């Protein structure tokens, strides 16, 4: 019996042949099997060596060049992966933590960037060589001198403004948008690049542009020369601030100045505009635009109220990130400055007007639609519908074609109308019910959301780095809702478990217990309640109504799931393609560093974001800063 057991346990030397019978393995098979055993033993020895090196804090030579494959898309059968998992378990770390500890990745920041690039830019973030000629010499001259308003770090200048003062209490306002569509054709190599990226990716200290640098340089509205533009001209009654007529042109515009909010915000204030004071370029134009912007803003507020929403309310500060190596400087910037409002309202007006323009000529475009309440209330679609959060009848992203593909698509369609009028439906790149247009809608929404998630993560990362850098042991925060708080000094929100019941706006002193840059996590506990706001009955009722609306939205989510389960195309109606809410909507208040565990928030006034034009290519908006990309400005040092 013992012999039988030993033979049975040596399959290399003996093969089973029937019940209780064994046959000696042929010599050739035996040699091959023994060689395989030796290779396996050798691999085990190599793997053990890898484990020993990793546990000792040294990255084995064989791991160089394989780090991202091991961490992002591993082959779990390789000895490198098995060694990494074994060593990480032995040291009580994750695999990424161990690789950083061994010097395989420079820092947690590098890990976050490498993982994002590996997933969304597997071929790298560079561009192939491109050739492009600007059609500026072929375009009619607008005969105006325009100016842009942007943050000092902005390089992709999409929009500019001109003002002409007319008799009879009227003025002509020109909204001039960079026109890369004039040099890019659908399906050409540059279009393929832009469609592959769909948007510029923003994050503190850096960005990954949608278009190659030569294209941006050819079409950005840089001061000191004529630039191709798609212009929207509005004749405005300066007494009532009503838009009398509008006109769209394709032309070249002379850009006189690139104004910078960093320099002008201290000068261009509500008080200085009221007194018509200050020494800065285009003062008369900005003074004339200020009451128009206020009137446009108030009109949208009345529409919001009619939609069952409250008026927009903005927090007092925005935040700019300045990155120098691994050091971060987070500076507060006054929110809601007059220049912000002017740029915001004119951009909302342009996107709404051009949305109606597309619909009037029956040319499809890509619209943002939003219901005031309900689940999945924000969607992108190819037919016009109200954006109740912004308080406009329709809204088509059109003012950031250098950094967002949807705007480039809409610009192609607008140019077709401007040049061909009623025949535009026949010559526009995208026809009604175009399957390619539907594909762009769906692909853009998914990609844009992923980019925004990475932006939020990196904003949160730099907030944690700032706390560590400043050696903060405590910080002051305000209650947002439930266990969620918002820090006062930095744009950081997080959930503090067991916080207790506090009114919204209550100021708290928090103890900072732990900072984890790799997992982008912060642990805090309540140290002291500093002060609590006085809550009026009206505010309490409004908050209760919001809570009830959120509860109703959750209940209605089952209906959306049922629609999602329908066969492809069954849920489409008149050219509508539903998609999840994208960044910039009130649902996630793009730009606020939101805890990924945080629940989606209703379109509360507290979630309104207004920012400078680098982070805010279109506008700041409420009910969801729709058209907003990142909300914070992300200066790139050294550029």
Regions found by a protein language model. Give the residues of each.
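Short, charged/polar, Gly/Pro-enriched secondary-structure boundary elements
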Residues: 28-36, 530-535
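Low-complexity, highly charged intrinsically disordered N-terminal segments
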Residues: 47-139, 143
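Charge-enriched amphipathic alpha-helical scaffolds
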Residues: 2-17
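OB-fold/S1-family single-stranded nucleic acid-binding modules
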Residues: 23, 518-543
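Electropositive polyanion-binding surfaces
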Residues: 1-5, 52-55, 68-72, 132-506, ...
């Amino acid at each position: 019996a013992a012999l039988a057991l030993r033979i049975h346990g040596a399959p290399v030397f003996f093969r089973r042949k029937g019940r209780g019978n064994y046959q000696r393995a042929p010599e050739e098979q035996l040699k091959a099997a023994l060689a395989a055993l030796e290779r396996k033993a050798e691999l085990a020895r190599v793997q053990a060596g890898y484990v020993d090196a990793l546990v000792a804090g040294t990255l084995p030579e064989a791991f160089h060049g394989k780090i991202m494959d091991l961490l992002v898309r591993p082959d779990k059968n390789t000895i490198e992966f098995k060694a990494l998992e074994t060593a990480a378990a032995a040291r009580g770390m994750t695999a990424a933590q161990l690789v950083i500890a061994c010097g395989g990745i420079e820092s947690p920041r590098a890990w976050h960037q490498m993982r994002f690039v590996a997933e969304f830019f597997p071929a790298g973030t560079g561009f192939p060589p491109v050739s492009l000629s600007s059609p500026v010499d072929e375009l009619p001259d607008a005969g105006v001198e325009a100016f842009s308003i942007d943050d000092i770090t902005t390089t992709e200048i999409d929009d500019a403004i001109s003002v002409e003062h007319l008799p009879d209490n009227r003025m002509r306002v020109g909204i001039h948008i960079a026109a890369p569509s004039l040099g890019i054709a659908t399906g050409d190599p540059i279009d393929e690049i832009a469609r592959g990226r769909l948007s510029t990716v923003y994050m503190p200290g850096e960005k990954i542009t949608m278009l190659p640098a030569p294209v941006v340089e050819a079409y950005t509205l840089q001061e000191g020369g004529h630039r191709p533009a798609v212009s929207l001209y509005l004749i405005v009654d300066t007494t009532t601030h009503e838009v009398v007529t509008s006109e769209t042109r394709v032309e070249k515009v002379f850009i006189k100045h690139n104004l910078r909010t960093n320099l002008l915000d201290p000068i261009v204030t509500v008080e200085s505009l009221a007194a018509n004071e200050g020494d800065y370029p285009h003062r008369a134009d900005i003074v004339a635009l200020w009451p128009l912007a206020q009137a446009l803003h108030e009109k949208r507020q009345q529409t919001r109220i009619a939609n069952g929403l409250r008026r927009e309310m903005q927090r007092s500060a925005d935040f700019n990130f300045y990155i120098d190596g691994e050091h971060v400087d987070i500076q507060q910037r006054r929110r809601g400055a007059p220049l912000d409002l002017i740029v915001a309202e004119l951009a909302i007006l342009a996107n709404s007007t051009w949305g109606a323009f597309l619909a009037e000529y029956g040319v499809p475009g890509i619209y943002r639609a939003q219901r005031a309440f309900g689940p999945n209330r924000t969607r992108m679609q190819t037919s016009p519908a109200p954006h109740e959060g912004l308080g406009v009848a329709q809204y088509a992203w059109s003012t950031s074609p250098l950094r967002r593909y949807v705007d480039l698509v809409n610009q192609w369609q607008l140019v077709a109308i401007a040049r061909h009028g009623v025949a535009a439906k026949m010559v526009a790149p995208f026809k009604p019910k175009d399957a390619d247009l539907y594909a762009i809608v769906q692909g853009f929404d998914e990609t844009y959301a992923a980019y925004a998630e990475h932006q939020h993560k990196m904003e949160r990362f730099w907030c944690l780095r700032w706390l560590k850098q400043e050696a903060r042991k405590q910080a002051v925060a305000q209650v947002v809702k439930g266990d969620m708080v918002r820090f006062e000094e930095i744009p950081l929100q997080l959930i503090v478990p067991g916080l207790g019941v506090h009114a919204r706006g209550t100021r708290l002193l928090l103890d900072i217990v732990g900072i984890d840059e790799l997992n982008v996590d912060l642990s805090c506990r309540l140290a002291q309640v500093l002060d609590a706001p006085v809550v009026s009955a009206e505010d309490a009722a409004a908050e209760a109504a919001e809570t009830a609306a959120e509860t109703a939205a959750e209940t209605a989510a089952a209906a959306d799931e049922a629609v999602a389960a329908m066969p492809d195309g069954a849920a489409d109606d008149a050219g509508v393609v539903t998609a999840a809410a994208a960044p910039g909507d009130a649902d996630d208040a793009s730009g606020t560093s939101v805890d990924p565990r945080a629940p989606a928030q209703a379109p509360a006034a507290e979630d309104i974001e207004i920012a400078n034009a680098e982070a805010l290519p279109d506008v700041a908006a409420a009910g969801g800063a729709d058209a907003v990309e990142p909300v914070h400005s992300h200066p790139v040092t050294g550029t």
